[in-house]
């Protein structure tokens, strides 16, 4: 896929890598011996940007050279874009997710005015993707359940805009809407779709969906946490640390189809550090020949920052 937008001089992640060097020096023990585990540079596919300053600190500490950022409980499309303008390592996505109380009524009445609003945002050329769109999302802390069909008028309109502007779309769709998601992917084979958390699907469904839909990308945020607060089987870890060998095998068989993410939301420094540390722990378990694709290459290519 050709780059979607012109690249910038800072897109190569040089500032982020410089921060990694500084972090590595600061991490040296007092006696000057190097730490055992080096920080692995990665591009974070999933951040709810509520606190740009905290996000910057976390990225510098944990090796994130880039991050896809979008709405949070305390942010909007406008504030996300403002942050990205001052922090070029942030990759802004525009969203009209029904999980937001401001947008939900429009989804319930299939209001095209909301799609026109998204069209205007994308026409600015400032956003590198669409999402996160929580079309079907089980209840979570602070957010009511959403259950809109991926084949409905709103998602269809979003996908048509993604096609128009040649942008990827990040969707949160649970396994209860798997059939409609598959049909949507077939209807828009030219639109890259990032599946947030991979829909928390088990291994065999992940494999099937990836084999059947070449435009689908399986995003692993919250799947690498030591423990998921909603369900213990949501993670891909067998003991809170080690990735199941079968998952590693699938990822290494299809390295061009997986993305890493933190699902950061800046609730507290401690909770966010856990999320970033889990990405580092996961990446250390992937064989080096394919690690770079999963860690950074796939995402940067999708958003037009790499060939």
Predicted regions and their residues:
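Mid-to-C-terminal alpha-helical segments outside catalytic/metal-binding sites
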Residues: 4, 8, 14, 28, ...
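Active-site beta-loop-alpha junctions enriched in small/polar residues
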Residues: 48, 72-73, 95-101, 133-136, ...
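A general structural detector for well-ordered alpha-helical segments in enzyme core domains, enriched
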Residues: 55-58, 79-83, 114-121, 154-158, ...
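N-terminal carbohydrate-binding/catalytic regions of secreted carbohydrate-active enzymes
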Residues: 47-87
């Amino acid at each position: 896929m050709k780059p979607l937008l012109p690249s910038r001089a800072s897109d190569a992640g040089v500032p982020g890598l410089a921060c990694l060097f500084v972090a590595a020096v600061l991490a040296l023990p007092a006696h000057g011996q190097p730490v055992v585990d080096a920080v692995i540079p990665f591009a974070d596919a999933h951040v709810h940007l509520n606190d740009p300053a905290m996000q910057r600190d976390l990225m510098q500490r944990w090796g994130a050279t880039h991050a896809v950022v979008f709405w949070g409980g305390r942010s909007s499309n406008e504030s996300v874009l403002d942050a990205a303008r001052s922090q070029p390592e942030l990759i802004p996505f525009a969203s009209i997710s029904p999980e937001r109380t401001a947008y939900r009524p429009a989804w319930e009445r299939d209001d095209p005015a909301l799609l026109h609003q998204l069209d205007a945002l994308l026409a600015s050329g400032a956003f590198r993707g669409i999402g996160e769109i929580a079309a079907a999302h089980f209840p979570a802390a602070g957010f009511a359940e959403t259950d809109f069909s991926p084949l409905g008028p709103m998602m269809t309109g979003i996908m048509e805009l993604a096609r128009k502007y040649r942008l990827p779309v990040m969707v949160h769709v649970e396994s209860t809407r798997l059939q409609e998601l598959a049909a949507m992917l077939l209807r828009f084979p030219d639109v890259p779709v990032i599946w947030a958390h991979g829909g928390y699907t088990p291994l065999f469904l992940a494999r099937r969906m990836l084999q059947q839909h070449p435009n689908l990308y399986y995003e692993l945020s919250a799947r690498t946490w030591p423990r998921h607060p909603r369900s213990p089987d949501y993670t891909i870890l067998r003991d809170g640390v080690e990735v199941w060998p079968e998952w590693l095998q699938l990822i290494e068989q299809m390295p061009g189809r997986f993305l890493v993410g933190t699902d950061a939301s800046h609730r507290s420094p401690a909770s966010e550090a856990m999320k970033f540390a889990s990405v580092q722990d996961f990446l250390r378990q992937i064989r080096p020949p394919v690690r770079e694709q999963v860690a950074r290459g796939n995402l940067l290519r999708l958003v037009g920052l790499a060939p």
